[in-house]
């Protein structure tokens, strides 16, 4: 098994398709579905979860987890009586119903078009200037008094909190709007949403003849605190009935806690300026496109923390299997193995040795960046062709975490044995995702480790029940901490 794969390069790029099935299903007669990597054509409408979406009757409202930039979804618009002012209502994100959840806006990181917004210090809804990214920056104050952004959050019960201004029925309920179009004082509560009301005053000189895209910077932590931990995000999404799976009572919270604990462990990396630093192994930062199937979104979340999802029919619970270093939970040898041991290897033409990972970079308003990694030439098999995998980590906004996950993927690809065994019936107690060991003199194996990928009940030659297991080669070195250097975007 090789050491860490450390060659990494960064690019700016467009979108690459990614598919990863990260589920394991474990019944009394046990089945497991493993990850399958490769291109997957979209099977649902791309509703543009991070974009400012035009009005449509099939728009879905996204969910922010962690820290993210995104646009809003138009849900209402009103023209003033004098036809000089437009009011727009944008739904930005759903909010967790968990009592400890927190949602906030960082108004110092809002953008109008591609320019940074500065708000007035007295009227907190009033935009007083726009600043571009030039050096030195250009500040445009013509916008002052022409653009207002009022922010709100609403609980699941419909209790609205004004973040930086007046209540909606005050901000969008003045005499300049026809009475029938004003925001009512009750009955329009935007339950469970973060939303904004934008007031735009027409002025050709200020460039406010039409609304440009607004990019909001939001923070949503389903269990409170200052970060979104993977176990908390998974549990929230699996149990929420509005935007998630709605499976309250059917998920294993213990496995979510275990994932949080593993994710909180620190890894060491080299900052862009040199030296040494540490950060938590895994965090979730991204936007859920609720127009896509729930399982697709769960897979994308778990891909960013190198885990699987499992179902156990005996307990009736969905749980998380963490892909990490484990000790053997069951031993197979001549005393409990029945019949042949079937061994195969992954086709050399399908074994990845290059990986290109796209992720939304927190250094550039979540615009896509790439990290590219290769298996060192000395670790390739003779005549092994270049085989690149392209993948997207939608809930990773950090180059260090992206490299860490990419290194694991390349190292895991070096472990290419696939083994099928039949055992006596006690082997049925092995669960999907467990690590087991095999001792067999013919193959020269002494306590050789494998990860269990499928378990099924089988009838053996003597008519008794046994267990058939499909295994993949396991090596704990896959889970070492690679040498990683943080990426800094070019100025």
Give the location of each predicted region.
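Beta-sheet entry/capping signal
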Residues: 109, 306-310, 315-319, 356, ...
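Surface-exposed, non-catalytic interaction/assembly patches
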Residues: 40-91, 285-286, 320-389, 466, ...
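Long hydrophobic segments that form regular secondary structure
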Residues: 366-458
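A generic structural motif
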Residues: 128, 135, 147-148, 318-319, ...
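Short, glycine/acidic-rich hinge or "gate" loops at secondary-structure transitions
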Residues: 41-45, 248-253, 310-324, 428-430, ...
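Acidic, low-complexity/disordered segments
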Residues: 338, 432-491
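Polar, S/T/G-rich
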Residues: 2-10, 18-300, 394-400
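Mobile, glycine-rich extracellular loop/lid and propeptide segments
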Residues: 280-285, 289-326, 434
């Amino acid at each position: 098994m090789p050491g860490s794969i450390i060659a990494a390069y960064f690019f700016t790029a467009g979108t690459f398709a990614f598919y990863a099935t990260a589920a394991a299903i474990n019944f009394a007669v046990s089945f497991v579905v493993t990850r399958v990597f490769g291109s997957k054509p979209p099977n649902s409408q791309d509703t543009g979860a991070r974009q400012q979406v035009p009005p449509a009757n099939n728009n879905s409202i996204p969910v922010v987890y962690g820290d993210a930039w995104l646009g809003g979804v138009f849900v209402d618009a009103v023209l003033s009586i004098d036809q000089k002012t437009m009011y727009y209502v944008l739904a930005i994100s759903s909010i967790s119903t968990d009592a400890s959840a927190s949602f906030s806006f960082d108004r110092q990181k809002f953008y109008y078009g591609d320019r940074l917004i500065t708000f007035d210090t007295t009227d907190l809804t009033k935009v007083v200037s726009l600043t571009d990214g030039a050096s030195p920056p250009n500040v445009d104050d013509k916008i002052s008094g022409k653009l207002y952004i009022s922010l709100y959050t609403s609980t699941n019960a419909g209790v609205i909190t004004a973040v930086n201004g007046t209540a909606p029925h005050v901000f969008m309920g003045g005499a300049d709007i026809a009475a029938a179009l004003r925001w009512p004082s009750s009955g329009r509560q935007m339950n469970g949403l973060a939303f904004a009301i934008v007031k735009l005053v027409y002025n050709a000189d200020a460039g406010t003849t039409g609304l440009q895209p607004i990019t909001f910077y939001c923070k949503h932590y389903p269990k409170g605190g200052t970060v979104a931990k993977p176990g908390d995000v998974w549990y929230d999404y699996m149990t929420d009935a509005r935007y998630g799976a709605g499976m309250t009572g059917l998920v294993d919270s213990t496995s979510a806690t275990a994932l949080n604990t593993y994710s909180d462990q620190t890894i060491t990396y080299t900052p862009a300026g040199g030296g040494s630093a540490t950060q938590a192994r895994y965090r979730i930062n991204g936007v859920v496109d609720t127009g896509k199937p729930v399982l697709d979104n769960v897979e994308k979340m778990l891909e960013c923390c190198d885990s699987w999802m499992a179902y156990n029919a005996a307990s009736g619970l969905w749980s998380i299997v963490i892909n990490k270093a484990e000790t053997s939970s069951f031993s197979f040898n001549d005393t409990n193995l029945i019949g042949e041991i079937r061994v195969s290897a992954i086709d050399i033409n399908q074994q990845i040795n290059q990986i290109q990972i796209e992720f939304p970079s927190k250094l550039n308003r979540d615009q896509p960046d790439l990290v590219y990694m290769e298996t060192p030439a000395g670790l390739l098999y003779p005549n092994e062709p270049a085989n690149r995998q392209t993948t997207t980590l939608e809930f990773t906004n950090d180059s260090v975490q992206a490299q860490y996950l990419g290194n694991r993927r390349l190292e895991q690809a070096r472990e290419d044995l696939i083994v099928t065994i039949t055992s006596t019936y006690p082997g049925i107690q092995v669960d999907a995702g467990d690590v087991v060991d095999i001792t067999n003199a013919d193959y020269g194996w002494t306590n050789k480790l494998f990860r269990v990928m499928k378990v099924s009940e089988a009838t053996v030659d003597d008519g008794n029940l046994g267990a058939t297991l499909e295994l993949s080669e396991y090596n704990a070195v896959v889970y070492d901490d690679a040498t990683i250097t943080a990426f800094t975007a070019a100025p």
